[in-house]
């Protein structure tokens, strides 16, 4: 049976989540990309707690950068999540692309977070 795009993404996401988990020492940087926005969270899976979050829906982001459906917006979210993580003392993370391909907006967010100082 042929899988459609949504089922393929869900299957990839489950496969990645089996292998990737965040700890207190090295939390998980989870990225969710919708059609119009992008979200990033730094999560400690052992405590089941979100440590840091950033998204293109935040009012201060919208007033500064506009819509969140471009690579430029993803780059800004990557920088923002890295700044907030470093401010809380989180330097190393495990990257979780959320079943999406490492391309386009997901790649832009990851590279911006790396340039801003996060290690993964």
UniProtKB/Swiss-Prot annotation:
InterPro entries given for it? Ribosomal_uL18_bac-type, Ribosomal_uL18_bac/euk
For this protein, the record's Pfam families field holds: Ribosomal_L18p (PF00861)
Q: Where is the composition biased (Basic and acidic residues)?
A: 1-10
Does the keyword section mention rRNA-binding? yes
**Skewed-composition ranges (Basic residues):** 11-20
UniProt entry keywords in alphabetical sequence = Ribonucleoprotein, Ribosomal protein, RNA-binding, rRNA-binding
Q: Which GO terms describe its cellular component?
A: cytosolic large ribosomal subunit
Against SUPFAM superfamilies, the record matches this protein to: Translational machinery components
Q: One GO molecular function term?
A: structural constituent of ribosome
UniProt keyword Cell inner membrane present: no
The GO biological-process annotations, alphabetized, read as:
translation
Name the segments for region: Disordered: 1-26
Q: How far does the signal peptide extend, from start to end residue?
A: none
Quaternary state and interactors: Part of the 50S ribosomal subunit; part of the 5S rRNA/L5/L18/L25 subcomplex. Contacts the 5S and 23S rRNAs.
Function of the molecule: This is one of the proteins that bind and probably mediate the attachment of the 5S RNA into the large ribosomal subunit, where it forms part of the central protuberance.
Stated family: Belongs to the universal ribosomal protein uL18 family.
Q: What is this protein called?
A: Large ribosomal subunit protein uL18
Organism, as annotated: Cyanothece sp. (strain PCC 7425 / ATCC 29141)
Its lineage opens with: Bacteria, Bacillati, Cyanobacteriota, Cyanophyceae, Gomontiellales
């Amino acid at each position: 049976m042929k899988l459609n795009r949504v089922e393929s993404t869900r299957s990839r996401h489950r496969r990645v989540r089996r292998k990737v988990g965040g700890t207190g020492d090295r939390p998980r940087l989870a990225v969710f990309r919708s059609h119009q926005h992008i979200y990033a969270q730094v999560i400690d899976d052992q405590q089941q707690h979100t440590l840091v979050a950033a998204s293109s829906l935040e009012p201060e982001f919208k007033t500064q950068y506009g819509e969140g459906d471009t690579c430029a917006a993803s780059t800004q979210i990557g920088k923002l999540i890295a700044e907030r993580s470093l401010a809380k003392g989180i330097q190393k993370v495990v990257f979780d692309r959320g079943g999406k391909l490492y391309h386009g907006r997901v790649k832009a967010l990851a590279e911006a977070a790396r340039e801003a100082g996060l290690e993964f």
